[in-house]
């Protein structure tokens, strides 16, 4: 994925750059409005453009329920469905599954849970998450991960990290088998660094994900109830 670094702050390592995505350029750092079900509530796509929004976020879990990823695929993707012609990032559904903690069961296969609409049981696996995001046709697809809660003891954090790394490999395999690895318009895939508040686990996760050679990397498992100082340390250990 083309990324041009324009400037880097010597004291903070903050970076100014440009991402080249299938539906346009994104100047970083950037605020990304959340369009859970394909659109940002109360705003028309033209309103977002006039406000300078360069990229929006869509939610894999919610879109898989309503209107369904199959219908969006038939509509030739989320961009056409939502009348948004600029870049879109879709999350993997992992964070929403985390929020349904009382209604879920995590196994090696994936996560079995009850959806919030009618209580029906669903299974979301790494492969299914990537398949849904491929149907949506987003510019950036996030890998399926396990977001540990806060507080979280080390034993749970280690087990959770194992899921995240093994699932990342399965996401990679699915992409290699079902999507082009190069070419104009291809979907880009981002790994998610987990490890709770444990510095060595976050370092391990970042290193192992980097070795898998994804297009980009995100910092996950923050802003889940931890104090601000813990959040800042977790970010520092992950970056």
How would you label these PLM feature ranges?
Residues 1-181:
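Non-catalytic, usually N-terminal nucleic-acid engagement modules in DNA/RNA processing proteins
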Residues 82, 184, 191:
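Extracellular/periplasmic catalytic domains that process cell-envelope and extracellular macromolecules
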Residues 174, 178, 187-239:
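Glycine-rich phosphate/ribose-binding loops and adjacent secondary-structure elements
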């Amino acid at each position: 994925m083309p990324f041009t670094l324009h400037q880097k702050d010597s004291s903070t390592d903050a970076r100014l750059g440009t991402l080249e995505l299938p539906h346009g350029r994104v100047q970083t750092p950037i605020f990304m409005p959340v369009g859970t079900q394909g659109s940002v509530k109360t705003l028309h796509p033209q309103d977002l453009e006039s406000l300078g929004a360069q990229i929006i976020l869509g939610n894999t879990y919610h879109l898989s329920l309503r209107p369904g990823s199959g219908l969006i695929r038939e509509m030739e993707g989320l961009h056409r469905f939502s009348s948004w012609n600029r870049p879109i990032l879709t999350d993997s559904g992992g964070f929403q599954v985390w929020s349904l903690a009382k209604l879920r069961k995590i196994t090696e296969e994936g996560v079995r849970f009850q959806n919030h609409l009618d209580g029906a049981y669903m299974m979301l696996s790494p492969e299914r998450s990537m398949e849904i995001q491929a149907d949506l046709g987003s510019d950036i697809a996030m890998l399926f991960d396990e977001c540990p809660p806060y507080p979280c003891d080390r034993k749970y954090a280690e087990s959770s990290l194992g899921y995240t790394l093994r699932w990342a490999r399965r996401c990679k395999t699915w992409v290699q088998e079902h999507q082009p690895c190069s070419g104009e318009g291809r979907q880009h895939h981002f790994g998610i660094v987990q490890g709770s508040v444990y510095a060595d686990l976050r370092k391990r996760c970042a290193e192992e994900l980097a070795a898998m050679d994804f297009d980009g990397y995100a910092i996950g498992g923050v802003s889940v109830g931890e104090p601000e100082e813990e959040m800042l340390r977790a970010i520092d250990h992950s970056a």
